[in-house]
Structure formats: C-alpha cells, structure tokens
Amino acid sequence: MRPPGFLSRAPSLNRAERGIWSCSMDQREPLPPAPAENEMKYDTNNNEEEEGEQFDFDSGDEIPEADRQAPSAPETGGAGASEAPAPTGGEDGAGAETTPVAEPTKLVLPMKVNPYSVIDITPFQEDQPPTPVPSAEEENVGLHVPCGYLVPVPCGYAVPSNLPLLLPAYSSPVIICATSLDEEAETPEVTEDRQPNSLSSEEPPTSEDQVGREDSALARWAADPANTAWMENPEEAIYDDVPRENSDSEPDEMIYDDVENGDEGGNSSLEYGWSSSEFESYEEQSDSECKNGIPRSFLRSNHKKQLSHDLTRLKEHYEKKMRDLMASTVGVVEIQQLRQKHELKMQKLVKAAKDGTKDGLERTRAAVKRGRSFIRTKSLIAQDHRSSLEEEQNLFIDVDCKHPEAILTPMPEGLSQQQVVRRYILGSVVDSEKNYVDALKRILEQYEKPLSEMEPKVLSERKLKTVFYRVKEILQCHSLFQIALASRVSEWDSVEMIGDVFVASFSKSMVLDAYSEYVNNFSTAVAVLKKTCATKPAFLEFLKQEQEASPDRTTLYSLMMKPIQRFPQFILLLQDMLKNTSKGHPDRLPLQMALTELETLAEKLNERKRDADQRCEVKQIAKAINERYLNKLLSSGSRYLIRSDDMIETVYNDRGEIVKTKERRVFMLNDVLMCATVSSRPSHDSRVMSSQRYLLKWSVPLGHVDAIEYGSSAGTGEHSRHLAVHPPESLAVVANAKPNKVYMGPGQLYQDLQNLLHDLNVIGQITQLIGNLKGNYQNLNQSVAHDWTSGLQRLILKKEDEIRAADCCRIQLQLPGKQDKSGRPTFFTAVFNTFTPAIKESWVNSLQMAKLALEEENHMGWFCVEDDGNHIKKEKHPLLVGHMPVMVAKQQEFKIECAAYNPEPYLNNESQPDSFSTAHGFLWIGSCTHQMGQIAIVSFQNSTPKVIECFNVESRILCMLYVPVEEKRREPGAPPDPETPAVRASDVPTICVGTEEGSISIYKSSQGSKKVRLQHFFTPEKSTVMSLACTSQSLYAGLVNGAVASYARAPDGSWDSEPQKVIKLGVLPVRSLLMMEDTLWAASGGQVFIISVETHAVEGQLEAHQEEGMVISHMAVSGVGIWIAFTSGSTLRLFHTETLKHLQDINIATPVHNMLPGHQRLSVTSLLVCHGLLMVGTSLGVLVALPVPRLQGIPKVTGRGMVSYHAHNSPVKFIVLATALHEKDKDKSRDSLAPGPEPQDEDQKDALPSGGAGSSLSQGDPDAAIWLGDSLGSMTQKSDLSSSSGSLSLSHGSSSLEHRSEDSTIYDLLKDPVSLRSKARRAKKAKASSALVVCGGQGHRRVHRKARQPHQEELAPTVMVWQIPLLNI
C-alpha cells in the first residue's frame, strides 16, 4: 500500500539561483497536461514553439493526463497481474498499459508481490486486490507510516534522513524540476489530486488503528518546520513520487543510470552515488519516451536501498536555501484551508466508498473530479495565475527610475575627421535609442494602462495581456542598455569604444527571450486588435483618439512594429561605425563581434516572424476558403505556406489570341499549388480591414506542376547563345515539337514567328530550285538565295527576342487534370502574368526549389541535432539536385583530388529562369592514379550537368585554380587590341593545374573550346606544387619544400616561366594559399605566414595550434574571420584576420558521431564558407553544415549543424561554390546573337545595313515589305518587293507588340512597358534565391541504409550537386 504523497516546493528564486539547486537541469518543465488546441502556453525555456499560435484563450480547461481514468482492463483470475513478468526496453515500454489487472471478487490473503510487477493504478484502486503485507518486519519498516518522499528502493531514490524507508510494489521516477509559468496553475491540482489517491491506496480496509497511527506519524512529521517550509512558497519545484494513472513508464526500468559504475554497477550507494549531471537531460517527458523505447544505457533495474551523496547534499542545500529565502505568499492560508477541507471530505468519501457498493464508487469518482475542478478553477486560476504572471515579470529588473539619460558631451577641439564622424554616428545611436524607448513607453502608458483601467473594459484582461505581451520586458532590456550606454557616452572622449556595450547588452539570453516571445506573439496580437476593431466601435474610437493626440500621429500598429525593426536599425548604425573605424582601433574587434551578435539575433527574429506570418496566413486561408476538404487539408500541421502572389490569369483561344483576363491569387504551399479568386466583404468603416473570401478555382499537387518556358527544350541551353543557321535549333521550334507543351505566347507575335518559319522553309525550297536553273542570272543565283536565308534568320532571332521580352512577366503552367475515359492522365494549361519580371523569376525559382524538396532523396537529406532552437530550419537545408559520375571511360582507378569552377558570363533573361539560374559555367575536376592525372570538364550550361570533355595529364594533379579574365582599362575611343584571344592568354579565362612532377599547366577555359593548353613550365627544382593562388598580376604556387614561388605576367598576358620571387617559409609543405585583400596567407606546418603582395615580405605570423604535429590542411575566410582545419583531428579553429586572436573551436566529430554508429576517427578534408553555412567535407565521406553569420562580422558558428545522409564512399576531396558572373560581357552578348558560321562573311556584311533598314521601316507603315537582299538599293526596288511576313521589322520594339488589340489589355493591366533595354536593367535587379554547391569524392551512398559492398563502378569519381535556399537575400 502507498503512504500519502508529499509535495515539496522550492522557494521563489531567480533564474541564477534556481540553477544552484536544480541539478543543472536544462529542461525544467514537469509533465504538463495535454493542452487543448487553443490553450494558453508559456515557455520559460524559450523553446521554439509554432509562432503565432501561442495565445489563443478560447478553450476551456482539460483534465490533466495524470487525472484521466485508466482504460478498463480485462478480468483475469487470481493475482496474475502481480506475477506478470516485467516488460523489457525492447517492448517500448508498453507493458504498463497492456498487462491485465485482476479485479478482486472477495478478500483473500494476498500473495507476496514482486517489487518489479506492473500494476495499473486506477484512481481508487478498485480494480486491484489489496496490496499484500509480505512480513511483519517489512510492516514495521513503514508500510503504514507516512513519509515525505515515496522511495522505490530498487531504484535507489533519495529518502529524507528523518523518514523511514519503504518497499513499494510499484513506483515511478522521482521528478525534480522547476515549475514554469503555466505549471503554477496545475500545482495545487496535483496536490489535491494525489492526496486522495494515496489515502485510497494506503488505508487497509480491515483496520482503523493503522489510520490513526498514520495520522499521528503525519502530525509528528508535520511538526518539524523544515518539513513544512515548502508550504510557504507554493510556486516552485515539485519533488513527487506518486505514480500517475495510465503511466507509460516501466516500473522495472528506471531512467537513471549508474554513472560511476557503468553497466556493471548496480549499486547506488554512498560511494557510488549519482552525479548532479545525471539530472541534466531528464524531464517528466521521459515517461512518454519510455513508450517509444529508451536507450538501454539509460535504463537500470538492479538497485539497492542506499542513498546518494549528491542527493543528500542537494537536500541539505535545498532546505538551507528555503530557510534563508522563504517569504510569505499571498493566498497561502486560503490554499491550506481549502486543502484541509478537501482532504477531510476525501477521507470520508474514500471510507464510504470502501464500505459501499459499486454505485458508491462511481459517486466518489465524480466527487473527486468535482473537487479537482473546484481546486483548479477557484483557488488557482482566479488567484495564483495572476500572481504567477507578476512573479515571472518580476524576474526582469525594474529600472524605470534608475537609468540616467545618455547625453553626449560637447565636442572637444583637435579631433580627426574619423573621430568627428564616429561622434556623429554615436549621436545617432543615442537619439535612435531614446526614440525607441519613448515608443515602448507610449505603448504602455498611452494604450495598455488606459485600456486596463477603462470601465467597462473593451479588452478583457486576457486579450490585454496577449496584445501587449512582453513589451514591458523589452523596455526593461533597453533600459538596462541605456544605463550602459549613458555610462559609455559620458566617457566617450577618453574611451571611444561602443562595440563592447552592444555585445554585453544584447548577448544576454533575456534579450532573446523577450524579443522571441514578442515576435512569436505578434501575429496573434495583431489579429486580436483587428478583430476587436471590427466588433467593438469603442475600441476603434479609442485608437483613433490616441493616434490623433500623439504629436506624430503614429498608429498603435506602427509602434508595435518597432521592436521587430530594431535590430536591423542597430546593424546599419554599427556598420556605419565600423566603416569609420580604422584597423588597429581598440573598438574594431568589439564592433565586429557586436555585428555578429546582432545579425544572429535579427536573423532568428526574422525567421520566426516569417514563420509566424506564414502559419497565420495558412489559418486565414483555411478559414476563408470555400472548400471544406481544402480547409482540412490546409489545417495539417506539416503543411506551410511558401508564398502567395496576386497574378493576372490570361485565357487564350486556339489561335493564340487573348480571350479574357482575370485577377487571381496563387498560393504555393510546400506540397500544393492553389488558384483562387479573391472576393472581399466591404466594410462600412474604411479603417477596418475588410474580410476576404476565396473562391477556389483549382488545387493540384505541387510535384505535378511544370512551368513551360519559351525555348525550354532539352539541349537548347547550349545553343541559346550561339544559335545555328538551321531553324530546328531555334527556340521557337519547341512550340511545334511538343504538342502537349504548346507555348501560348502573345497572339500576333507568335503568329508572326510562325509565318517567318514558314517562309524560311519556302526559301529553302526556292534555294534548291535555283540550283536547278540552267541559265546564269545576275539577280537570281545561289548567293542571292543565301542572302534571303540570312535575312530571314535574323528576323527570326529578333522576333524571338520580342517574344521573350513580352514573356518577362508570363508564367505558363502545365497542370494535371482528371483522367480521360481510358484512364490516361490529362493536362491543362494556365497562363499567368506577374506584375514585375523579378516576381516571375522569384516565383519560378521557388517552384523549382519546392519541387526539389519533395523528391525522395531530400525527404531524409540531413540529420539535425536541435540546440535550443539554434538548429537550421528544414526550409533552409541544402537540397540534393543530383549526383553523377564524372568519367567518360570506365577507369575506376582514378580518384578525385581537386576541382576549380569557371563561371561564365551569360545573357541573363528573366523569361528563362531555370534550376541553375545562379550557375552558368564549367567545373574542372582533377582525378589521379598513382602515376598520372585526368581532367574532366562538367558543363552547367543547361538544366542537366554533363561531362563535355575528358583528357589525361602527364602527372598526378594536386591542385587547380581558376584565373579570371584580366580587367583592361581602355581609354574611350581607343582602338581594340589587335591581338587575338588565342594569342593573348589574359583575354580568356584560364585554369592553372599544379602537378606532382613540379609543373604548372595553363589551359584555356571558355565555352565550346576543346582542350587548349596555353602554357607549361616547371617550378624551381621541379618541386611538387601543393597549392595555387593568384591576383590579376601575380600567380603564387605553394611548394612541397616549404617555399612560395611568385610568377608575374608577361607583356602578352601569359605568365613568366621563371618565378619573380621565391619566398622560403620553412621545410614543411605549403598546403594552402589564400588571398586576402593585399596579402597572401600561406600555411606551412602549423603556422600561417602573412605575405605582402607588394613587397613579398612576411608581415605577420599566426600559430594556429600549439600542439606538435598539427599541420594545417585547409583555410577558408569569411568576413573578418578565417577558419583553419588540420590534417589530423576533427577540430576547426576560428581566428580574427586583423588581430589574429583565437575566437572559437568547433569539433565536427560531435554531430557526426550523433548520426553514425560507433566512434570512427575522422578529419577535415575540404572546407567552404558560403551564404551563412560553413560546409565541411570529412574523411568519412559525409558533409557537415554549420550555421554562421552572413555579414562582415565574425563568422562564428551560431548553433549545432547538420550532417548529410548523402555521402561519398571516400573522403570529400573538394567543395566549391558554383556562381555566375553578374556583370555582362557586352561583346559576348553581341556575338551570341550573331548568325552561325555559314555564311559568316555575308552575315557580318549584312548585319549593319539590314538593321538600319529595319529601323527606318519601323517608323513607317507596319505592313511595309522587308528587304532581304545584300544591299539596300532604292526605295523603289524595296516597294516593289513583297513578303509574307507582313508587319515584321528588325527593330527592338515591335509594332505588333505595342498596337495589337489582343495584346493591349494585358499590358495595360501590368503597366510594364516592354523593351530589351529595360529588360536588361531589370535583370540586374533580380535577386537569386538559391546557390549551387558541388562536392566530389568516390561514389555515392545513403547513410543508414543496409550496408553492402559497393560495386566497382559505384566507386567512380562522383560529384554531388546541392542547391542552397537563400531565404534572407
């Protein structure tokens, strides 16, 4: 039988003091009741909840999990339940629920109970036989004596020193925790809940004397003040061992492990107690985790009746703290009286139940429930909830009357210009902060305070707290900041430092706590305001009055937006301050650290705000949609909104003419695409936002949506810039080639293009017939026919450009329809127009990324370990585009060694976004055998990367480097350089290859070029080339003998074969070179040498590691930090590039070993920092991605990272970023529009005059004829000619595009004039939404799949292409 449970509470402590006695517990929440759907939630641990959903108070109370009735168990005979074997961990802890419990039919002498038996405890034990009394000795031990802690001896739990030891037949883990905000509302409930259970289970039905002994023992125990001190502070921790009903925990397997003895230690004695760290990661959720299986290392079943030193010391320290810090709490007397009345009533009910019938038991059960509800509603929510909120708010220091105002002293004389500018920026910081604090005070004083005092209340207390949640805490954070700021401002002229004040003030957890909860609640608060404005005119009138009374007429919404905008403002101010802080200034490093802190904080807040808004919008869409099934579909927890856009749907007829247009709203969710018509409900008040309803047009799975782009056929990517003579290579032919993907462009433009293609075909037939002529005619021969063909080809190119220009805002989607009668799939087409070209490009890229995320290979792409919300969200995970071998011949002996990426300038066009919109170049990959090397060139010119060339090299390739085109500064009007690109190496991009034999080879790298080696020369003493780096005028080679060779450019643009300078650094190989502004960083051994580019002298030296034998292998720079990796070990080190200070160490083995079984040794084999990620290739073949800031601050790792499930079968040898050149090469752009090589001379001759003729014709009659000859001739001759192409012209602006009636409607709606020049300008404004990263190694595998021996062909050199979403660009 069970003695009454005891609730022990800790005094009211602040967070720092709680950490002293809470056994270093990271998670201090007791097991909460299952919350209702809209139940109010508070989270003192700052865990990331679903933003925008925290505060919805419309739901009633729900019975806690511990108070629910157990499911009825089937009847069995005898005491079989007590003899049932204990379930093992492998059974997922299900035994506590599935073991049948015997229902007694009569009182019998019970058998001895196994302490590890599984017993289902119902509220009054009506389904259980009386717990047997094993022996008189055990009876004297204390079966009927109440205690402070229920101590299941097999688990080795702690017992108060003044209480006897018990031998219970069942147990549950001791819970040691601190109550959170919402738990305070449940603590008294647990008190009242579990006391009657204890009574009902402990009082024997045959003896009332035992009850008296219990009461007297309880009275003696309660007489000790140390044992009743907990009642003075009912707000703190609970030490409780009362078994919960329907508990999922296994009584025979406890969650605490013997740390000292490991698996062999079964004793929890004074010598082998628990360390306090054992409580670090255990919370009450462990019970639920047992249901899914706890790791065996955390389970223990062989314990003895001993005490732990740690828990004894913990108890003594806890009792001392209680005596020292105990304070009276309002309402304690009432709670005690209520508890005594309830206990007395429960004792009578239990006694009546034991002597009564089954009907009496049911009445008792109902009475207990009513008692619980009474305790919950009367004594708790009405009284303790408000005090609990006030207590939580008091955790923040009230500094309203303590902070001085920051005043900048008068400017002294003799300051430098930089000091003057810094003082002005400091003044901006002070003024900005003062205005911000005033805005926060206005929220509280002009809105919250009057609303709370208003009678009758227009906002309930609950809604008032929701609207102004955490504003006071944010104000207190900034009041503390103002204290530090005022102190620093007063001594500015002597200190001139501000960065450390920002770091100290905004790196505190309380700042992130307050802002995070404010941002998470913002959407809910705004929704409450909108709803109240619409339903209560008095509230709307109050807002109007306050706005009109304010000097700047700022609305409440604008004031509430200021906390969300605050950190971006800080970042801009600190960036200005940093720009005016010279290197070597003591404030420079603190400013960079402050930028890092603020950027990390702002990024988290922005992401949470975005997530909250998206989830809130999904809920609003679900409410406003007219389809019930879609409402349920949108309510799914795993579905989130990517974006919603207003577009104009265009309906065409069979001839390509516009029939009608209609405004639509297109919703892109992570797996569904929906199109709806927006219908607004008008409101009588213009200030009240009218509610919107959506009439659904269609919804389709996102994975089945295809965006059809003009010219998006396979293989056209390579030909789009160098179109061939023959029309089948033209982009326009795609419309006829694929009937199921017919492109529906502007009607007249499309028809003109079809006419041109028809005429080109006719001219081809005429050309053949002319060849059959017997006579020789001056104006009718093969040369004239070629002129006709060339002129038509130019017209086709121009017309395609016009269509692309018209398509800069057009999106054509192929969508799945219903199956036809034969069961075959059908498709329908929808054409939309966006309002700007940038929206279209962004939308198509979002579609491509969302579809990529739905692919099977990305369902389990990365393993993440959550770290208090600092993990990378799934929406930002790199997505695997694909993997491919990079060998032409099947020669598996080649192994990947290095790579270099050559970005290509390309004619950007918004109408042609593809999956590789940020990569249009070539990846050169070097592979090696033991004696020779091989180079494979992979093209990223179209949507599918492919190997375009592969050739061998005489020696093993150890390093590669891309050398861009040398920037030439020509005077305006100067003649072009007469040298050809084939002769001058600096006019074309090149790839430098360093080999083991000590040679450097220079290869030409440009589109369409085959293997062209421009140079080949040897290093001094033919020393092996380990690394390469370059500037525009110098090439540097790190050699195996510890030297760096510097080569200068020759007058013809090539590299001198003899080094300009050889810089000797040491005897160890120079494994890594890195250019940083005007210095070269060279790693030799464990040191980094900083070499001046101008003087070739060593300016500085960095010792990266003090241990002997640590050799630097890789370096990566970002902002003002440099990450350094070593050939052995798994540690990365971060150093400041200006002061060379050691800032951070990261061990990548930690996340890798969390995913991979065992503890395999690993090292870093490649390194890359890009777009907020530090990507690390490992010797085990897996990638590790760690989050880092993106601005010019310090790139420290800001959270635990991710480990890729996609891996190579060998070390990851390289990680490169595939970028695109954003600046266009105008010469190449012009060349790309030139006709093909045949007949090249005639085309070059005719290009200029033909363009002039077209331009002149475009100003006249749109039906004027086109001249296709090789000379202009006279206007009379041209007027006598005719053309079937009608209104065609060579001008960039087509008359059909501007004046045709069927096209005018859509362009009037879009208000977007179309021209090639404006198109080119818009292309520069468009922002990329993703980036490509390529890694290489041997083969490809999925981690955690069934291990099998890979085939030989699976070990071929392979690259994996990743696409990284850029959410914050």
From Swiss-Prot:
One annotated GO molecular function: guanyl-nucleotide exchange factor activity
DH domain boundaries: 421-608
Top-rank taxon: Eukaryota
UniProt feature, compositional bias: Polar residues: 196-209
SS bond list: none
N5-methylglutamine modifications at: Q1338
Transmembrane regions listed in the UniProt entry: none
Disorder named in the UniProt entry: Slowed nerve conduction velocity: Affected individuals present a reduction in nerve conduction velocities without any clinical signs of peripheral or central nervous system dysfunction. SNCV inheritance is autosomal dominant.
Function: May play a role in developmental myelination of peripheral nerves.
Protein name: Rho guanine nucleotide exchange factor 10
Organism listed in the record: Homo sapiens
